[in-house]
Amino acid sequence: CSYCADPNTPATWRQLAATAGTGALGDLTAHIVSLSDMIVGKEIVEVFASWDTPYAERPDARDSSRKLKIDTDDQIYVIVKYEDGRIGSMSSSRVSVARPVSLAYEIQGSKGSVKFEMTRINELLYYSNGCDPKERGYKIIKGNTRNGDYANFCGTDEQGIAYNEIMSIQAHDILTAITEDRKVDIDIAYGQYVDTVLEAMATSAREGRWVKVSEMQETV
């Protein structure tokens, strides 16, 4: 994200550890951890993180004549280990000048790869290692009326959904679960698990070492 890319952007509660705890880690990386769980299907068990705050001071949002010390991270980079031994990497930034709002992932496997970028929300890039070598390369798979809730917003293919529709789908699923008195995959207990992973990342960034998520389970 780029909402802090301008060093003259006033400091609010999100930039202060006393009110926000962490910066890009808590605000942005939580989404990546949740996405990783869904896509990889394995929990993160160990992390190594490094974070950075390029702009040490910002104007006070309540008094522009004052400067406030920024004590939260503007960007963080993490190596993660999953419970099955696989490794991955994550990064979050709120000072990326060219990416106002972005979320992306890439998975590399022995049989191929998939890539996704939120700014092209209706497209999934797919690479197959089993196709004719002359035809190898990423191919675009487009969302259509046979995929999920797409047809609830679009009468035909190629129309496309956007971020606001995704939020509507989330709200619908949560409210439906409440009215039907059933559990959802993302609940308070899961939120606590994500916080445990984030705390392990924060501890790693502060102490400069690999941290097991299990070390944090009694502190979150």
Residue ranges and their predicted role:
Residues C1-I70, L124, G208:
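Predominantly a Rossmann-like dinucleotide-binding segment in NAD(P)-dependent oxidoreductases
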Residues S89-S92, F116-E117:
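Beta-strand scaffold of nucleotide-dependent catalytic cores
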Residues A162, I166-Q170, L198-E207:
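Stable alpha-helical structural segments in soluble proteins, enriched in small hydrophobic residues
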Residues M38, D52, P59-D73, Y77, ...:
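C-terminal glycine/acidic-rich active-site capping loop/insertion
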Residues A11, T203-V220:
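C-terminal capping/lid region of NAD(P)-dependent oxidoreductase domains
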Residues V47-F48, D185-D187, V211-E215:
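Short, hydrophobic secondary-structure boundary micro-motifs
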Residues S91-P100:
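Glycine-rich phosphate/pyrophosphate-binding beta-alpha loops
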